[in-house]
Amino acid sequence: PWGYPLLLFPCVVLFGINYFAFKIVGVICLVGAFIFLYYHPILSKERFRMSVLLVLALLTGNIFYWGYVNSVSSELPFFCFLMFSFWTMNKLYALKEQTEKRTILYIGLGILLFFTAQIRTEGYFLFISLIVLQWKNRLLGWRFFLPYASALCIWFVFTLVFPSGYTEHFEHFKVVTLTNLLHNIQTFYEYPAQILYIPFSLFNLFFWVNCLLGLYISSRKLTAESVYLVSTIMLLICWPYDVIRYWLSLFPLCFIFFIQGFRFMCMVWGKKAGKWVLYPIIGILICSVWKVSIKYATSPIQIYTTINPNVEGESAQEMYAFLRTN
């Protein structure tokens, strides 16, 4: 996809191949994602406000997210534009009626969703979220189709201007086996404890049970987010690769539903009793995340490894020169 290269294009024009400038783009995108999450039109309501604040406390101090600032990859830009897309969809469709003043915004929404999908192709699930959101609000009329029409026009321009990839994504499904599916399910099940640095595997069961409960009770309000999350997880289960970075933009949604489900379970015991259970446990999770992140940030780090090579080193520059020549 051409979305991320286009984001880096201004940096290349201004600074050349400067990896520090590329990483600044990652920092801006990560901060931008947090801002869009905080000001989300639905999540900013009283019912979700505490959940969002707790999620941001888990994310802003989590070295898992800040660690991606040190790499030039599409995860953080996609995370930012995904949150921007959710913010825009909920902002436009918070009211059921369509107005002429919003016509240009509906066109812009289609362009935004398409560009997000051009950063990472799982972003195309946003169009499914949009369809469900429009259907839920019973939106009719020609403006209903504007986001799709504008996205289709931009897609046509992209196909004319930019070359396509060497293969199709559907080619990857040819190597999927039942073993892959079972392995992915097991691996994904274990991710929450890894992301939150919890040494107890039983926490994963606790997390996913509450996440599913929160998804069930919050899906009517967070329709677009619920549809996108379920669709993408189903794709990743069937995907032949189990890379944790694919989940970087999904975990904030999982955390929100987890806290919503956990709050509901706690409130079943009574409002006061629930708070005495909810906040200490979430507080322990936040302290665990921040403790590990501070320890990691203050420890000597081996900067260059086989996974994170020195892309500005002499051998790397020789390889780039060879590729440019040939």
Predicted regions and their residues:
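Signature aromatic-anchored transmembrane alpha helix within multi-pass, membrane-resident enzymes
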Residues: R49-L54, R102-I107, F127, F145-C153, ...
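Membrane-interface alpha helices of multi-pass inner-membrane proteins
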Residues: V55-A57, M83, T103-R120, F127-V132, ...
